[in-house]
């Protein structure tokens, strides 16, 4: 293997090693130290998982690949969230944390991930345009088949408001959401992709290996990273709760924001790497697909995990969780409305980031409902502007796929739909 690849894998293994020692020995010296050790292991394993999932696309194609890679790539986030949901079946105190991690990761992805990738991509295009003395683009254009992802996300965002209205996530709702996820994978698997896959960073080094070696490395990384994540998910989740009390920070806040940062970091970094290499559409396409994952498979799995842990068939939501769901769903509707025409403008990216930052200053319940209303108002304005794209977007998940490249683009910018 290339020395650069060996060094990166070894570094991740070294970072994860203390957590394995803690887990095997049962050592728990301090809640904050536990959080650092187990959190670092989650980040390291997430990087290995992301590299393997990216490189695996060289050898696996079709709907099966999409299904497998989608499930594997979200393992870090799901492992923590489903642990909380499972524990809530026997301990009601954990019910709040299951929804906290989901809403935090969801808003982080759209409020931080989307704008960051778009602004980086447009900055790169601006520099390229300046060198070539041509007009710089003001928006990132997505391929036409991205409408499938946006269509599914739009339907899921609208359906998400039913959850706070019911005050719970019923198990039948979870089953429906999981079926929607299966339909999304099937529909995504039908999309034509005739171009050459592009790889960056460690994934590119893995892809360059001989076929037999490459497949062995990919399988090895999958197994090793999954084993680490499954081993440390429980102590990491518990350390988030314990560390909050130890340092005087709301445990709910740590679960909502620190856990998603650990699990989403590799995906963000890989998306930014794509944007830095002029593949902005591929980068944002991956993050849009991740939103579909979260609103379907993740939310749908919560009541099932709760029931499996000894709870009832419904995962109850308290007032704070209902507030968080409304804020998250309204943000998703706003994000979908802004990209409905498959053009992501720089001012839209700045607006999403600004509103995301504003929520940390607005902490009271009434203020957060006002912020939700503001997000919905922005969505209404964007829907009016993009009204011609509403019906095509809502119909996209049900239409027969058409092989087509977006104008002025290339197949290499076709967004991935694996995460």
Task: Name each model-derived stretch.
Residues 1-419:
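Hydrophobic alpha-helical segments, chiefly the membrane-spanning helices
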């Amino acid at each position: 293997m290339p020395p650069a690849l060996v060094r990166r894998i070894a570094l991740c293994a070294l970072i994860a090693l203390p957590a394995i020692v803690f887990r095997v020995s049962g050592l728990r010296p301090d809640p904050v130290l536990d959080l650092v050790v187990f959190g670092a292991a989650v980040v390291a394993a997430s990087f290995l998982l992301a590299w393997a999932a990216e490189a695996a696309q060289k050898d696996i194609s079709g709907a099966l690949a999409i299904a497998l890679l989608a499930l594997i790539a979200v393992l870090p986030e799901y492992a923590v969230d489903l642990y909380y949901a499972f524990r809530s079946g026997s301990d009601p105190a954990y019910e709040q944390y299951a929804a906290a991690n989901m809403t935090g990761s969801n808003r982080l992805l759209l409020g931080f991930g989307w704008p960051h990738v778009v602004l980086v991509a447009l900055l790169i295009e601006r520099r390229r345009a300046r060198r070539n003395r041509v007009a710089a683009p003001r928006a990132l254009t997505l391929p036409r088949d991205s409408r499938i992802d946006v269509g599914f996300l739009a339907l899921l965002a609208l359906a998400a408001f039913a959850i706070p209205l019911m005050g719970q996530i019923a198990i039948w709702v979870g089953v429906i959401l999981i079926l929607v996820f299966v339909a999304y994978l099937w529909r995504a698997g039908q999309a034509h992709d005739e171009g050459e896959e592009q790889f960056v960073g460690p994934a590119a080094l893995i892809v360059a290996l001989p076929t037999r070696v490459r497949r062995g490395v990919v399988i090895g990384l999958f197994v090793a990273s999954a084993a680490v994540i499954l081993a440390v998910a429980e102590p990491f989740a518990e350390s988030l709760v314990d560390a909050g009390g130890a340092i005087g920070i709301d445990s709910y806040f740590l679960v909502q924001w620190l856990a998603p940062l650990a699990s989403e970091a590799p995906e963000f970094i890989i998306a930014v790497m794509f944007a830095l290499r002029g593949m902005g559409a591929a980068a944002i396409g991956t993050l849009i697909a991740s939103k579909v994952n979260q609103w379907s498979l993740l939310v749908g799995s919560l009541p099932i995990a709760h029931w499996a842990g000894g709870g009832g068939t419904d995962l109850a939501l308290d007032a704070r969780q209902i507030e968080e769901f409304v804020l998250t769903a309204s943000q998703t509707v706003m994000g979908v409305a802004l990209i409905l025409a498959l053009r992501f403008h720089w001012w839209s990216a700045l607006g999403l980031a600004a509103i995301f930052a504003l929520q940390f200053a607005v902490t009271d319940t009434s203020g957060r409902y006002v912020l939700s209303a503001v997000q919905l108002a922005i969505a209404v304005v964007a829907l009016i502007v993009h009204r011609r794209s509403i019906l095509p977007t809502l119909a996209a998940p049900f239409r027969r796929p058409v092989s087509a490249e977006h104008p002025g683009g290339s197949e290499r910018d076709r967004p991935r739909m694996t995460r």
